[in-house]
């Protein structure tokens, strides 16, 4: 297998730099990068308004509902009232479809779980100390102060954790659920990129 055929999936704490790592890996391997682009692709493919996906992006349903049977065939075009479970199923369908097209970098959206049985998967969780996360959040203009940034980071982490745990039955951020866990604040972006690339090339050599 070629390294460029690897499916790199990045889970991340809010503000940890996981998206920046994903973009850099995408460039170095010359493979597509999918983050919020997944929502656009899913909305376009299934004829559902983009705001529906954005409202439910990495957010657990407010009430427990069982997955909709035959979800891919039951979604009315341009629906304004599609439930979270159906949207999750459709998004997962898009992730699987994109994975069949070749190597890629996916950020979030439980893609590590969706692709868990794919031998080309390399799953990563990125974390960082709170001070570093706050600095990054302020620098990119999401907040004006570090206090606001920390509040935003913690709030978004809670949302991501509940979403991931709800749909996967796994524990978000638990090292046992990932192939690599990286402290981006300690290692820095370039070192992290080198580590992941090394793992990617090693995985490619071992898969016939």
What are these regions (language model features)?
Residues 3-8, 12, 102:
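Pre-Walker A (Motif I) flank of P-loop NTPase domains
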Residues 10-26:
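Glycine-rich phosphate-binding P-loop
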Residues 32-43:
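Short beta-strand-centered segment that lines the nucleotide-binding/catalytic pocket of NTP-utilizing
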Residues 43-103:
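ATP-dependent small-molecule kinase phosphotransfer cores
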Residues 63-68, 144-190:
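Small-molecule kinase domains that catalyze NTP-dependent phosphoryl transfer to phosphate-bearing small molecules
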Residues 92, 189-197:
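Short, amphipathic alpha-helical "lid/cap" segments that border enzyme active or binding sites
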Residues 92-141:
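ATP-dependent NMP and nucleoside kinases share a basic, alpha-helical "lid"
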Residues 204-208:
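C-terminal helical "lid" subdomain and adjoining coupling/linker elements of P-loop NTPases
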């Amino acid at each position: 297998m070629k390294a460029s055929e690897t499916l790199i999936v990045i889970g991340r704490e809010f503000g940890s730099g996981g998206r920046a790592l994903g973009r850099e890996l995408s460039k170095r391997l010359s493979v597509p990068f999918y983050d919020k682009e997944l929502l656009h692709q899913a909305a376009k493919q299934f004829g559902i308004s983009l705001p529906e996906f954005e409202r439910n992006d990495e957010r657990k349903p407010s009430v427990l509902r069982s997955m909709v049977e035959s979800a891919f065939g039951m979604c009315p075009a341009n629906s304004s009232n599609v439930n979270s479970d159906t949207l999750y199923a459709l998004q997962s369908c898009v992730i699987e479809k994109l994975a069949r097209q070749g190597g890629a970098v996916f950020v979030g959206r439980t893609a590590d779980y969706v692709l868990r049985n794919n031998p080309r998967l390399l799953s990563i969780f990125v974390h960082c100390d709170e001070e570093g996360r706050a600095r990054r959040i302020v620098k990119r203009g999401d907040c004006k102060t570090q206090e606001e940034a920390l509040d935003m980071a913690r709030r978004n982490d809670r949302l991501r954790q509940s979403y991931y745990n709800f749909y996967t039955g796994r524990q978000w951020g638990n090292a046992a659920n990932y192939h690599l866990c990286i402290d981006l604040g300690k290692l820095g972006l370039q070192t992290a990129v080198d580590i992941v690339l090394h793992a990617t090339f090693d995985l490619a050599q071992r898969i016939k």
